[in-house]
UniProtKB/Swiss-Prot annotation:
Function text: Catalyzes the exchange of L-carnitine for gamma-butyrobetaine.
GO cellular component: plasma membrane
Protein name in UniProt: L-carnitine/gamma-butyrobetaine antiporter
Transmembrane segments annotated in the record for this chain: 10-30, 51-71, 92-112, 143-163, 195-215, 231-251, 263-283, 316-336, 347-367, 398-418, 446-466, 475-495
Protein's cellular compartments: Cell inner membrane
Organism: Shigella flexneri serotype 5b (strain 8401)
Length: 504
C-alpha cells in the first residue's frame, strides 16, 4: 500500500474528502430533484443579495493590484531562470483555449438576449436603450477587469512555483508566509484545499453542463439524433476518452496542439460570422458599445440595485464575478505553469491585452449576430427557449447563417475541441493539487488526471438532470464564496513573501 501511494503520489487528506463530499451532494440531488431545486433557489438568493457587494469590491481592488504589478517594483522580475517554454503565439493560444470553452460560446451567443429582455438601470425591455447597453455589459463582464484578477494570481503562483521552488501546487502551499508553516500544512491548510477542490469540481461540472447541450443539439440538427440525457452522457464520455489521449501525449503535445487548433478554428468561425452577418453593423455596434462602457463604467462597477431590486446585478454581474473567482486559482496555476521564464510585466500585459482582445472579439461578433437576427425577425429566441431550451436557441443563431450545414459542422467541431482543452487544463490542476509530490518539470500521474475528469463528467450529468440555468448559476455562486476568501489569502501571502524574498 505504501509503495502504491508513492507510485501514484496521491495525498489522501485532499484527495478523498472532495470525492466523499461531492458524492454525497450528487446522491442527495439525484434522490430528490424537486427538493434540490428549492435549495438551489434559496442559496442563489442568499449569496447574491448578502455577498454581492463583496464580489464587486474584490474585482476593483484586484484591478489596482494589476497596475501595481505592471508599474511597480516587480515589473521586470523574471518568473524562473529558464527561457520561456512556449513561443509567444502558442502561449497566447494556450491561455485563450484554457480560459474559454464551449461554455463561452454558449454565453457569447445568447447573453445579449437576456440583457436586452431584462435590462439594468430600469430600462424598458427590448428598448433602444436596452439594446445600446446590451453589448457594453458583455464587454464589461468579459473585459480587462476579470483578466487582471487572473494575471495577478498567475504571477503569485508562478512566483511560488518557479522563484521559491515549491514542490506542491495547491492553495495551502502558498499560505506559509501568511499563516505560518504549522497552520498552512495542518488542519487549516487542509480545510482551505478541500474548499478549493470541491468548488472547482462543481465549477468544471457547470462548464460541461453548458457545453454538452450545444454539442448534442448540433448532432440533432446535423444527424437527426434526438437530444436526450443519455446522449449528453455519451458525449461527456467521449470528451473524457479524448482527454485521456491528450494527457498520454504529455502537456507539451497534449495541451498545445488542441489549444492551437481550437484557437485557429475559433478565429476562423468568428471571421465567417463577421463577414456574412454584417461587418459594418458589428464594427459600429462595437464602437458605440465601447463608448457606452466608458460612460457607464463607474455605475457598472458598483451596481447592486438595492432600491429597485430588479435583480440584474445579482443574476449577472455577481454571477460572473463568482465565475471568475471560482476559476481564478485553478486557471492561475495552469497559466503559471506555461509562463515559466517570462517577466511579471510580460505575463500581466499578455493576459490582459491578449485575452481581452480575444473575448471582446468573440462577444462582439456573436452578440451582434444574435441582435441582428432578432431585429430582422429571423429567429424568435423567447419561443425557442420556452419550447426547446436555451441550447436550441443558440444553435438556431448559427444555423441561420449562410451555408448552414458547413457552419454547423464548424460549430460542432469547435465546441467539441474547446471543451477537451478546458477539461485538460482543469484535470491537470486537480491532479497537481491532490498529489503528494509533483516537482518542478514533472507531470501529475495519468490515472489521477483521468479519474478527476470522470468525476467532473458525473457532475455535469447531474446538473443537466436538474435542468435550466439556475442550478448552474447557483453552483458557481455558492462555490465562489469560500474561494473569495482563499483568493484574498493567496494574494496577501504573495505580497508579504515577495517583499521579504524578491529583492534586487
Amino acid at each position: 500500500m505504501k509503495n502504491e501511494k508513492r507510485k501514484t503520489g496521491i495525498e489522501p487528506k485532499v484527495f478523498f474528502p472532495p470525492l466523499i463530499i461531492v458524492g454525497i451532494l450528487c446522491w442527495l440531488t439525484v434522490r430528490d430533484l424537486d427538493a434540490a431545486n428549492v435549495v438551489i433557489n434559496a442559496v442563489f438568493s442568499y449569496v447574491t443579495n448578502v455577498w454581492g457587494w463583496a464580489f464587486e469590491w474584490y474585482m476593483v481592488v484586484m484591478l489596482f493590484g494589476w497596475f501595481w504589478l505592471v508599474f511597480g517594483p516587480y515589473a521586470k522580475k523574471r518568473l524562473g531562470n529558464e527561457p520561456p517554454e512556449f513561443s509567444t503565439a502558442s502561449w497566447i493560444f494556450m491561455m485563450f483555449a484554457s480560459c474559454t470553452s464551449a461554455a463561452v460560446l454558449f454565453w457569447g451567443s445568447i447573453e445579449i438576449y437576456y440583457y436586452i429582455s431584462t435590462p439594468p438601470f430600469g430600462l424598458e425591455p427590448n428598448s433602444t436603450g436596452a439594446k445600446e447597453l446590451g453589448l457594453a455589459y458583455s464587454l464589461f463582464h468579459w473585459g480587462p477587469l476579470p483578466w487582471a484578477t487572473y494575471s495577478f494570481l498567475s504571477v503569485a503562483f508562478a512566483y511560488f512555483f518557479f522563484v521559491r521552488k515549491m514542490e506542491v501546487i495547491r492553495p495551502s502551499s502558498t499560505l506559509v508566509p501568511l499563516v505560518g508553516e504549522k497552520h498552512a500544512k495542518g488542519l487549516f491548510g487542509t480545510i482551505v484545499d478541500n474548499f478549493y477542490l470541491v468548488a472547482l469540481i462543481f465549477a468544471m461540472g457547470t462548464s460541461l453542463g453548458l457545453a454538452t447541450p450545444l454539442v448534442t443539439e448540433c448532432m440533432q440538427w446535423l444527424f437527426g439524433i434526438p437530444h436526450t440525457l443519455q446522449l449528453d452522457a455519451i458525449i461527456i464520455t467521449c470528451w473524457i476518452i479524448l482527454h485521456a489521449i491528450c494527457v498520454a501525449c504529455g502537456l507539451q503535445k497534449g495541451g498545445r496542439i488542441p489549444s492551437d487548433v481550437r484557437s485557429y478554428l475559433s478565429f476562423l468561425m468568428l471571421g465567417w460570422v463577421f463577414i456574412v452577418s454584417g461587418a459594418s453593423f458589428i464594427m459600429n455596434y462595437f464602437t458605440d458599445s465601447v463608448g457606452m462602457l466608458l460612460m457607464y463604467l463607474p455605475r457598472m462597477l458598483f451596481y447592486t440595485d438595492p432600491i429597485a431590486k430588479g435583480g440584474f446585478p445579482q443574476g449577472w454581474t455577481v454571477f460572473y464575478w463568482a465565475w471568475w473567482v471560482i476559476y481564478a486559482i485553478q486557471m492561475s496555476i495552469f497559466l503559471a505553469r506555461i509562463s515559466r521564464g517570462r517577466t511579471v510585466r510580460e505575463l500581466c500585459f499578455g493576459m490582459v491585452m491578449g485575452l481581452t482582445a480575444s473575448t471582446w472579439i468573440l462577444w462582439t461578433v456573436l452578440g451582434s449576430n444574435t441582435l441582428l437576427l432578432m431585429d430582422k425577425n429571423i429567429i424568435n429566441i423567447p419561443n425557442l427557449i420556452e419550447q426547446y431550451g436555451v441550447a436550441r436557441a443558440i444553435i438556431e443563431t448559427w444555423a441561420a447563417l449562410p451555408l448552414s450545414t458547413a457552419t454547423m459542422w464548424g460549430f460542432f467541431i469547435l465546441c467539441f475541441i474547446a471543451t477537451v482543452t478546458l477539461v485538460n487544463a482543469c484535470s491537470y490542476t486537480l491532479a497537481m493539487s491532490t498529489c503528494r509530490e509533483v516537482r518542478d518539470g514533472e507531470e501529475p500521474p495519468l490515472l489521477v488526471r483521468i479519474g478527476w475528469s470522470i468525476l467532473v463528467g458525473i457532475i455535469g450529468i447531474v446538473l443537466l438532470a436538474l435542468g435550466g440555468l439556475k442550478p448552474i448559476q447557483t453552483a458557481i455562486i455558492a462555490g465562489g464564496c469560500p474561494l473569495f476568501f482563499v483568493n484574498i489569502m493567496v494574494t496577501l501571502s504573495f505580497i508579504k513573501d515577495a517583499k521579504q524574498n524578491w529583492k534586487d
